[in-house]
Amino acid sequence: MARVLNVEIPNHKRIVIALCSIFGIGKSLATEIVEKTAKLQEEKFGKKFPILTENTKVKEINEEVLQVIRDVAKTYKTEGDLHREVQSNIKRLIEIKCYRGIRHRKGLPVRGQVTQKNARTRKGPRKTIMAKKDKGK
C-alpha cells in the first residue's frame, strides 16, 4: 500500500478514489491533485513515466510520481490539521455561547433540525424514566 500524508491508500483502487480515503480530500480535490500532479510530472520527468490520469490505479504508480503526489497533497489542509481546526471552531462557538455553541454543548442537532420525534443519532439512545411504585398498598 502506498502512503500519502501518513495514510495508507488502497493499491487496488483508482488514484482519485484512493485519495478520498484521506480526511479532508473529496472527489473534486482528489481530481485537482491528480491534474496538478500530471502537469508537474510532465515538467519534471517528460515521457519517462506514463502520464497520471484519473483512471490510473495506485499499484501502477511508481515511487517518483507518488512523491510528486505527496508534495501536491501537502499544500492542502488535511488530516490532523483539519481535525484541529474543526475542533477549535467548535470550541470557539461554545466559548462565546452562541446558539450553535449551546447546541454543541447539549449534544443536540446544530443545523435547525426538528428534535421532537427524531434526532436519535445526535441525542443518543432513549433514556427511560422508571415509574414510581405505590408504597403502603
Swiss-Prot record:
Organism: Mesomycoplasma hyopneumoniae (strain 7448)
Keywords annotated in UniProt: Ribonucleoprotein, Ribosomal protein, RNA-binding, rRNA-binding, tRNA-binding
Any single GO CC term annotated in Swiss-Prot or TrEMBL for this entry: small ribosomal subunit
Organism superkingdom: Bacteria
Gene Ontology biological process terms from the UniProt entry: translation
Residue ranges with Basic residues bias: 119-130
Role played: Located at the top of the head of the 30S subunit, it contacts several helices of the 16S rRNA. In the 70S ribosome it contacts the 23S rRNA (bridge B1a) and protein L5 of the 50S subunit (bridge B1b), connecting the 2 subunits; these bridges are implicated in subunit movement. Contacts the tRNAs in the A and P-sites.
Quaternary structure, from the entry: Part of the 30S ribosomal subunit. Forms a loose heterodimer with protein S19. Forms two bridges to the 50S subunit in the 70S ribosome.
Protein name stated in the entry: Small ribosomal subunit protein uS13
RNA-binding recorded as keyword: yes
PANTHER family: 30S RIBOSOMAL PROTEIN S13/40S RIBOSOMAL PROTEIN S18, SMALL RIBOSOMAL SUBUNIT PROTEIN US13M
Database matches in Pfam families: Ribosomal_S13
PROSITE patterns, alphabetized: RIBOSOMAL_S13_1, RIBOSOMAL_S13_2
Gene: rpsM
GO MF term set: rRNA binding; structural constituent of ribosome; tRNA binding
Organism ancestry: Bacteria, Bacillati, Mycoplasmatota, Mycoplasmoidales, Metamycoplasmataceae
InterPro entries assigned to the protein according to its UniProt record, in alphabetical order: Rbsml_uS13_C, Ribosomal_uS13, Ribosomal_uS13-like_H2TH, Ribosomal_uS13_CS
Region span, Disordered: 114-137
Protein family: Belongs to the universal ribosomal protein uS13 family.
